From Swiss-Prot:
Keywords: Aminoacyl-tRNA synthetase, ATP-binding, Cytoplasm, Ligase, Metal-binding, Nucleotide-binding, Protein biosynthesis, RNA-binding, tRNA-binding, Zinc. The keyword Cell division does not apply. Gene3D superfamilies: 2.40.30.130, 3.10.310.40, 3.30.54.20, 6.10.250.550, Bira Bifunctional Protein, Domain 2, Threonyl-trna Synthetase, Chain A, domain 2. One of its GO terms (biological process) is alanyl-tRNA aminoacylation. This is Alanine--tRNA ligase. Zn(2+) binds at residues 556, 560, 658, 662. Binds 1 zinc ion per subunit. Catalyzes the attachment of alanine to tRNA(Ala) in a two-step reaction: alanine is first activated by ATP to form Ala-AMP and then transferred to the acceptor end of tRNA(Ala). Also edits incorrectly charged Ser-tRNA(Ala) and Gly-tRNA(Ala) via its editing domain. Belongs to the class-II aminoacyl-tRNA synthetase family. GO terms for cellular component: cytosol. The keyword RNA-binding applies. Its cofactor is Zn(2+). Its EC number is 6.1.1.7.
């Protein structure tokens, strides 16, 4: 019996013997900006199939890690649904075609995997006579086990137009015990669990035109995908993927941690399978650099992880456990994916932090969902308002899918449309709140300008002064104008770097450039007029503020050094999440799960400053995207790059794709100083820093503060720490003494209060106000008085910071008078709110002027109850 690892190895070996080149699995974060995650084995090769790029070699084979969450709710319920899965694939880019693809798949399935030929079935596209003929003549496959299927099952296309073609699928018949009878075939009703697809062969041979007609492609391609989990189940004689050697050790670990037994009942099986699948998905996602967040791929990770945590609760396990599952996943998959072992500690940390966050709100979220469902069912309804599911998501971080799953378990429908409407409403508010850079109607103007003149020629990499012909002049606000020239040395804001500033002038005109933006590579200069009025079709001198440009360039190059240093000290999971570079400072947002320590920040500063002192040359070059990748250039996932990219290289340290302006030698940065580090969103941190003279000023300010402290403490630099520690120790002793005095004073005041208590109906009553008591002080007084009196009612107020009340009633009297009732009356009269238990309650008030009225009314209530 072959193991999962052996199946992988044999697949790659088989196709390498057929002259295929083995490509390592690509990241789950694809280069394709249209995709959040790698969802199929062909995703890394999409540009070659679409003809956007030339393939590096004609034949390729891979095992590719993939993630799909479109049917997340089915994961755990069925034997074969997964979020994470592996696709074995062989690909041809204009090389071999149907005959070889079919013959080799048959050879591998029957001779290498040794699957019983009599159990195999094949599907082909309705009109694909060629594929059927190859199966029959080349593989000696029986025609009666070939089923022709329509476009929805056996046709692949990249979209409504473009590359497309028929498919042929290999299925395994598990037997009539899984549906149908001896005459059943693929596609018959009730046979979904009987005929299991294990391999899909896609023959990309057509180009669909706008009118729907098909034209033959000049180069025909092969794209195949075989699900490793399904193949392992068939080869190992399992009807459930979770019982294969790929997943069962992880499932056993889930049972061991949660104290649950697989096979005990369907509910336990369901939850254990969810945890097993999701532990694998979470481990691989975090390993590839995904951080939990509320959007994009980070939200997909969060949904998967939180669903698993909930299923731990369903098994009765309330402690953290998902981070512990990481070890078993790594142990199982590190042979095929060795980087898992290198990153295991980082993965555990990120998973644990996210699990801790959610555990704090999970029970509350589940309780709220169930309360809402109880209310519905009590009133004979079964539809949950979308506003409720949105509130759970927005306020408590409770994923919509969990609300939906809990509701479904109780027979309630969640109104998804209402939830999505609330989400869209929130997004619209966010969109409206953003600053609009271009005025209304500007977009259509840009389109017209582009059609007429094309793009602006940018000369700013080579020079900071140039002449440009004014092609367009549009009035903005406050004597500002938007100017577009045929060419410009002014850098337009992009890639986090702000636009250049400077001046534009001629003999009879002068204007100050405040900002430069671009749309469709058309550079739009925002100019404040200082003299005269510019005219279209005239040539003007364009001059960049070189001091600001140089300072901005220093900060931009320093940002690259910071990025690299972060990855060295914090971990390679660090990815850029945003940046801002101007002449005064730099700001860098990055993916990370916790605050950086002072030690880490110090090391990062040291690395950057050490590099600056080395005075390394900064080299800018242009390469194809493939060449840039070979150079190890860092690039932003999700960004769309052209065929030729600009590479900024600090030799031996940092290599990044970047379109910004940089200094030619990092020694010119002078000094690098981090000024702040903090969180800006879940899983995203921000560092702000200064360079050069700005960094010197920060250092000087800190030195001046230190000098001032030394003078005040009469200390020197060498004994300052010792002096501060001594003063802190003295302060601590003084605070202890003060606390003892306060306790003595409180005891004295309490005794005085007790001696002054009046008696109403045989009950000791104290109603008093204090100016310098905290709510905790009031509570202590009440407890002391109650301890010394069998029957007592204490009503206290404090006006220390704001009006506050505390009321105590001995338990011998709570059947007659409740502290909560008295405190509510006090709060009501003074315009506040409060409540509590029958024996103790607290409240806040707003109107101190009503305090005596409140005391008077409470006294009357007490007298009425006791006399």
């Amino acid at each position: 019996m072959l193991t999962g690892n052996e199946i992988r190895e044999k697949f790659i070996e088989f196709f390498m013997q057929k002259q295929h080149k083995h490509f390592e699995s690509a990241s789950l974060i694809p280069d394709d900006p249209t995709l959040l995650l790698t969802v199929a084995g062909m995703v890394p090769f999409k540009p070659y199939f679409l003809g956007q790029k030339e393939a590096p070699c004609p034949r390729v084979t891979t095992y590719q890690k993939c993630i799909r969450t479109n049917d997340l709710e089915n994961v755990g319920r069925t034997a074969r649904h997964h979020t994470f899965f592996e696709m074995l694939g062989n690909f041809s880019f204009g090389n071999y075609f149907k005959k070889e693809a079919i013959k080799w798949s048959w050879e591998f399935v029957t001779e290498v995997l040794k699957i019983n030929k009599d159990k195999l079935w094949v599907t082909v596209f309705t009109t694909d006579d060629e594929a059927e003929k190859i199966w029959i003549e080349e593989c000696n496959f029986p025609k009666e086990r070939i089923v022709r299927m329509g476009e929805s099952e056996n046709w692949w296309s990249a979209g409504p137009t473009g590359s497309c073609g028929p498919c042929s699928e290999i299925h395994v018949d598990l037997g009539i015990q899984y549906g149908g009878d001896e005459n059943s075939k693929i596609g018959d009703e009730g046979t979904d669990n009987r005929f299991i697809e294990i391999w899909n062969l896609v023959f990309t041979e057509w180009n669909r035109m706008e009118d729907g007609s098909l034209e033959p492609l000049p180069k025909k391609n092969i794209d195949t995908g075989a699900g490793l989990e399904r193949i392992a189940a068939v080869v190992q004689g399992k009807t459930n993927n979770f019982e294969t050697d790929l997943l069962f050790p992880i499932l056993e670990e889930a049972g061991k941690i949660t104290g649950s037994q697989y096979g005990k009942n369907p509910e336990t099986n369901f939850s254990l399978k969810v945890i097993t699948d999701h532990a694998r998905a979470v481990t691989f996602l975090v390993n590839d650099g995904v951080i939990p967040s509320n959007e994009g791929r980070g939200y997909i990770l969060r949904r998967i992880l939180r669903r698993a945590v909930r299923h731990g609760r369903l098994l009765g396990y309330k402690d953290l456990f998902m981070y512990k599952m990481v070890d078993k996943v790594v142990e199982k998959f590190e042979i095929a994916y060795p980087d898992l072992r290198k990153n295991v500690e980082n993965i555990r940390k990120i998973v644990k932090i996210e699990e801790e966050k959610f555990s704090n709100t999970l029970d509350q979220g589940i309780q709220l969902v169930n309360q809402e469902i109880d209310n519905l069912l009590t009133n004979g309804k079964n539809k949950l308002d979308g506003e409720i599911s949105f509130k759970l998501y927005d306020t408590y971080g409770f994923p919509y899918e969990l609300t939906e799953e809990i509701a479904e378990e109780r027979g309630v429908i969640v109104l998804r449309e209402e939830f999505e409407a609330k989400m869209e409403e929130q997004k619209e508010k966010a969109r409206s709140a953003r600053e609009v850079v271009m005025e209304k109607g500007q977009d259509s103007f840009i389109e017209e300008f582009y059609d007429k003149y094309g793009v602006t020629e940018f000369t700013g990499y080579e020079k900071t002064e140039d002449e440009g012909k004014l092609l367009s002049l549009r009035e903005a606000k406050d004597r500002k104008y938007l100017l577009i020239f045929d060419k410009t040395p002014f850098y337009a804001e992009s890639g986090g770097q702000v636009g250049d500033q400077g001046k534009i002038y001629s003999d009879n005109f002068a204007g100050k450039v405040l900002d430069v933006q671009k749309q469709k590579d058309i550079f739009i200069h925002t100019v404040k007029l200082e003299k005269g009025m510019p005219e279209e079709n005239k040539t003007y001198k364009l001059e960049v503020d070189v001091v600001k440009r140089l300072d901005t360039a220093k900060n931009h190059t320093a940002t690259h050094l910071l990025h690299k240093a972060l990855r060295e000290i914090v971990g390679t999971h660090v990815q850029q999440a945003g940046s801002l570079v101007d002449s005064e400072k730099l700001r860098f947002d990055f993916s990370h799960y916790e605050a950086l320590t002072e030690e880490q920040l110090s090391k990062i500063e040291d690395i950057v400053n050490k590099k600056i002192r080395e005075g390394i040359e900064v080299v800018v070059s242009h390469h194809s995207i493939e060449e840039a990748k070979k150079l190890g250039a860092m690039m932003l996932f999700g960004d769309k790059y052209g065929d030729v990219v600009r590479v900024v290289d600090v030799h031996g340290f940092s290599t990044e794709l970047c379109g910004g302006t940089h200094i030619d030698n990092i020694g010119k940065i002078g000094l690098f100083k981090i000024t702040s580090e903090g969180g800006i969103a879940a899983g995203v941190r921000r560092i702000e820093a200064k360079t050069g003279y700005g960094a010197y000023l920060v250092e000087k300010e800190e030195a001046d503060i230190l000098k001032n402290i030394e003078q005040k403490l009469k200390a020197t630099n060498s004994n300052l720490v010792e002096k501060v520690e001594k003063n802190l120790e003295t302060l601590k002793d003084t605070e202890k003494e003060l606390e003892i005095l306060k306790q003595k004073l409180a005891l004295f005041e309490t005794k005085a209060a007790i001696s002054g208590m009046e008696e109403i109906g045989g009950v000791k009553v104290l109603i008093a106000a204090f100016k310098d008591k905290s709510t905790e002080d009031l509570r202590t007084m009440i407890d002391t008085i109650k301890d010394n009196n069998e029957k007592a009612i204490i009503v206290l107020a404090s006006t220390q910071d704001k009006l506050a009340f505390a009321v105590g009633v001995t338990k011998t009297l709570t059947d007659k008078i409740k502290a909560g009732d008295l405190v509510k009356k006090l709060a009501e009269i003074t315009g506040g709110k409060g409540g509590g238990r029958p024996d103790f309650a607290q409240a806040g008030g707003k109107d101190e002027g009503k305090l005596l009225d409140a005391f008077k009314e409470v006294r009357e209530i007490i007298e009425a109850k006791l006399v």
